[in-house]
Curated annotation (Swiss-Prot):
<comment type="similarity">
    <text>Belongs to the TrpB family.</text>
</comment>
<dbReference type="GO" id="GO:0004834">
    <property type="term" value="F:tryptophan synthase activity"/>
</dbReference>
<keyword id="KW-0057">Aromatic amino acid biosynthesis</keyword>
<dbReference type="InterPro" id="IPR006654">
    <property type="entry name" value="Trp_synth_beta"/>
</dbReference>
<dbReference type="InterPro" id="IPR006653">
    <property type="entry name" value="Trp_synth_b_CS"/>
</dbReference>
<dbReference type="InterPro" id="IPR001926">
    <property type="entry name" value="TrpB-like_PALP"/>
</dbReference>
<keyword id="KW-0663">Pyridoxal phosphate</keyword>
<comment type="pathway">
    <text>Amino-acid biosynthesis; L-tryptophan biosynthesis; L-tryptophan from chorismate: step 5/5.</text>
</comment>
<feature type="modified residue" description="N6-(pyridoxal phosphate)lysine">
    <location>
        <position position="83"/>
    </location>
</feature>
<dbReference type="InterPro" id="IPR023026">
    <property type="entry name" value="Trp_synth_beta/beta-like"/>
</dbReference>
<comment type="function">
    <text>The beta subunit is responsible for the synthesis of L-tryptophan from indole and L-serine.</text>
</comment>
<comment type="subunit">
    <text>Tetramer of two alpha and two beta chains.</text>
</comment>
<keyword id="KW-0456">Lyase</keyword>
<keyword id="KW-0822">Tryptophan biosynthesis</keyword>
<keyword id="KW-0028">Amino-acid biosynthesis</keyword>
<dbReference type="Pfam" id="PF00291">
    <property type="entry name" value="PALP"/>
</dbReference>
<protein>
    <recommendedName>
        <fullName>Tryptophan synthase beta chain 2</fullName>
        <ecNumber>4.2.1.20</ecNumber>
    </recommendedName>
</protein>
Length: 390
């Protein structure tokens, strides 16, 4: 494994971390083929996380939009989002490696909750780094992490969001590699993380492919998923990369590309190195990383997983910015049509679906939307944006 997707990916980290990454790669390559490890992983995903998740035909939404819409229900998983697929996988691997402590970064809080849950499950200490701005936005999730035994460490530097939480987590790891595993929550970071996280999230795509073939007898025309770091998207895209299936990623368009206040890294960024890998980043002319903005705490990251940069460059996938206002409309649309409240991250994918369906050439097409998480965590924020005082 060279950790490259075309020219993207690789390892750009301090020399002190190279041995830890090499140890992790060797363990991942070994245990991902180990029968007992895979039996354990399958057991915990089924009995603890709640897999397989359903592929739900959203009939009301389909009728309204003029497409055959299916929702891959990752929102039904324990802890409320797809993140648990990866945290169970990595925490199990860390245990097999003899690590006793997990550290993680989190933006929306979903990865932090899923890491805290995995730590409790496997009896490991957990420290979660979270930007103070995100701590304020996601107070409920902070409590959920703490009640599961994790220590939440607020990060007050820089933009006080996900980027800065990652920086602090990496500093911690440099000083604690002997007994600590850094459980990165998305398909970003230095090799082997993008490949490893994709591996643990690919269960989404494998299930969705099998389910749609059983229901429809053929593959879908299009897959839509939201993209921050990009793990839920790569998880579902992975099973369809070699097929004639259109792949669309919905990025956090914030207040619009022209405003500069957005998280649309692929739509408006450029090549650069961030958090250990070469990908697309939001940066100024001097290469300084810009702050990202999205109504969704999980999409305000100024980078993106390197495989997404490769998929865009090769034309295999396209990426569309979705504004905060459009995402909020998507949140209301799914809630009112189906009684399903999506996470604000997933609402970007619903809004992207709405724009997709408005094009005459897409009428009647079969679309799978990856519903990466549920909206419980966003109720107070969404209510405030909709002018409702709770």
């Amino acid at each position: 494994m060279d950790g490259k997707f075309g020219k993207y990916g690789g390892i750009f980290v301090p020399e002190l971390l190279i041995p830890a990454l090499e140890e992790l790669e060797a363990a991942f390559l070994h245990y991902s083929k180990d029968r007992r490890f895979n039996e354990d992983l399958e057991h915990y995903l089924r009995e603890y996380a709640g897999r397989p998740t359903g592929l739900y035909h959203a009939r009301n939404l389909s009728e309204k939009l003029g497409c055959r819409v299916y929702l891959k229900r990752e929102d039904m998983l324990h802890t409320g989002a797809h993140k648990i697929n990866n945290t169970i996988g990595q925490a199990l691997l860390a245990g097999y490696m003899g690590k006793r402590r997990l550290i993680a970064e989190t933006g929306a809080g979903q990865h932090g909750i899923a890491t805290a849950a995995a730590g409790a499950l496997f009896g490991m200490d957990v420290d979660v780094y979270m930007g103070t701005e995100d701590v304020e936005r996601q107070k409920l999730n902070v409590f959920r992490m703490e009640i599961s035994g994790a220590r939440v460490i607020p990060v007050d530097s820089g933009s006080r969001t996900l980027k800065d939480a990652i920086n602090q987590a990496m500093r911690d790891w440099i000083s604690s590699v002997e007994d600590t595993h850094y459980l990165i929550g998305s398909t970003m970071g230095p090799h082997p993380y993008p490949t490893m996280v994709k591996h643990f999230q690919s269960v989404i795509g494998r299930e969705a492919r099998e389910q749609i073939l059983e229901i429809e007898g053929e593959l879908p025309d299009t897959i839509i998923a939201c993209v921050g770091g990009g793990s839920n998207a790569i998880g579902i895209f992975s099973a369809f990369l070699d097929d004639d299936v259109e792949l669309i990623g919905a990025e956090g368009g914030g207040e619009g590309i022209e405003s500069g206040n957005h998280g649309a890294t692929l739509s408006a960024g450029s090549e650069g190195v961030l958090h250990g890998s070469l990908s697309y980043v939001l940066q100024d002319d001097d290469g300084q990383i810009n702050e990202a903005h999205s109504v969704s705490a999980g999409l305000d990251y100024p980078g993106v997983g390197p495989e997404h940069a490769y998929l865009m460059e090769t034309g295999r996938a396209m990426y569309e910015p979705i504004t905060d206002a459009e995402a909020l409309r998507g949140f209301k649309l799914l809630s009112r049509c189906e009684g399903i409240m999506p996470a604000l991250e997933s609402a970007h994918a619903i809004a992207c679906l709405e724009k997709y369906a408005s094009k005459p050439e897409n009428r009647g097409k079969t679309v799978i939307v990856n519903l990466s998480g549920r909206g419980d965590k966003d109720m107070f924020l969404a209510a405030g944006l909709l002018g409702v005082d709770l």
